[in-house]
A protein has these predicted regions:
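Catalytic core of DAGKc-family lipid kinases
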Residues: 135-230
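Short glycine-rich anion-binding loops that position phosphate/pyrophosphate groups of nucleotides
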Residues: 39-40, 111-113, 136
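Short, solvent-exposed amphipathic alpha-helical segments in soluble enzyme
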Residues: 49-54, 122-123, 229
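Glycine- and small hydrophobic-enriched segments that form the cores of compact globular domains
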Residues: 96-106, 114-116, 126-127, 131
Length: 230
């Protein structure tokens, strides 16, 4: 997942690489921007409106937001924002697929908002620009006070980015009996790659997530068995 960021150190193939060498370039000018804001946080209402006004009126972009954001009573009651609100494109999580039409994601909130934005894209993720307006900000390096300048820099191209890996999660049910040899390890303690690829069963859920996965026992009284491979 490409995330726009402030200068800092990253590793690449065993050596320290200057992040300044990783840059975002546009093959064509971006047209569609997804704005994700932290829900049920009234302090983000004004920053959200400021950003949308800027993107629509000054940058002349198509702005996508969640339908539940537009349906917010505080937003709908603002008559001065109604003209902008009518130009916003809305979508519903789990119903509308916007994965192929978004050029850039802008997040307003904390790390949780960024993780949520990542979950909306189960394939390739557009570049993400995250403004720190939440409780945690390890993944949100931009300050909103200078949002116009920062957004302009991104649209001009050559902005610094960091590529973040995501985890692929599969829930498999109805597993067939696995051959005992699949449980053996090599001399160095590494489980052979075909241990997983040879497993058979019905995949009931598959997700790509950023940072972490929580395995919950659900209605069961205990978690019977966990196989973890790295």
């Amino acid at each position: 997942m490409p995330a726009l960021h402030s200068p800092g150190q990253t590793t690449c193939r065993g050596h320290i690489q200057d992040p300044a060498s990783q840059r975002l370039t546009w093959s064509k000018p971006p047209l569609n921007v997804l704005v994700i804001r932290k829900i049920r946080d009234e302090t983000l209402l004004e920053p959200f409106k400021e950003l949308c006004r800027f993107l629509v009126e000054e940058k002349h972009l198509m702005v996508y937001v969640e339908k539940k954001v537009v349906d917010d009573g505080s937003l709908m009651s603002d008559e001065s924002f109604s003209a902008i609100c009518n130009q916003l494109c809305t979508f519903r999580e789990g119903y509308d697929d916007i994965s192929d039409c978004i050029d850039l994601i802008i997040c307003l909130g904390g790390d949780g908002t960024l993780l949520y934005a990542s979950s909306l894209f189960q394939g390739s993720v557009p570049p993400v620009m995250a403004f720190h307006l939440g409780s945690l900000g390890f993944l949100t390096p931009f300050k909103f006070e200078s949002f116009k300048t920062e957004v302009d820099k991104v649209f001009e191209g050559n902005a610094a980015i960091i590529l973040r890996s995501r985890l692929k999660v599969k829930v498999v049910k109805g597993m067939f009996q696995r051959n005992e040899q699949l449980f053996t390890t090599q001399e160095n303690g590494v489980v052979p790659h075909n241990h997983i690829s040879n497993e058979a069963g019905k995949i009931t859920l598959q997700l790509q997530v950023l940072n972490e996965v929580v395995v919950d026992r659900g209605p069961s009284s205990y978690l019977s068995n966990v196989d973890l491979y790295l």
